[in-house]
């Protein structure tokens, strides 16, 4: 099956989104963070995938020596290189879309455009986990996508906090 990489900055909800897209049960939340790379085999609607869940980029670094930050950056670059070589498709998870997210996404997009990969687009997933109603969702979409990129269109929305019985948010 295809290899799908789930990328993004630290603490954006990559594993949370992955769990909801695939019905997986990987540990996620504020008390848990993915270390390095996590591989998961899933079947979604009859299609097999290998999911690469990555440690978020730009995570805080415990300073133990003068080289702590440099070593962390080198580790992140190595992991990104491995992911780039292995993955067929790339999901980039953002929540509040910041200029750092934009720079990260721009770098990934440029690398893909300059590669020989057959699918050279990044699928951006807006993890609006703090959004509690549809009005706020439309505001966030307008201010963080349409106002910035002009023609952004909402393709699909899944609110993870929706109660399945009452359908209330």
Question: Which residue ranges define each predicted feature?
Answer:
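Conserved GTPase G-domain substructure that encodes guanine base recognition and part of the catalytic core
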Residues: 1-169
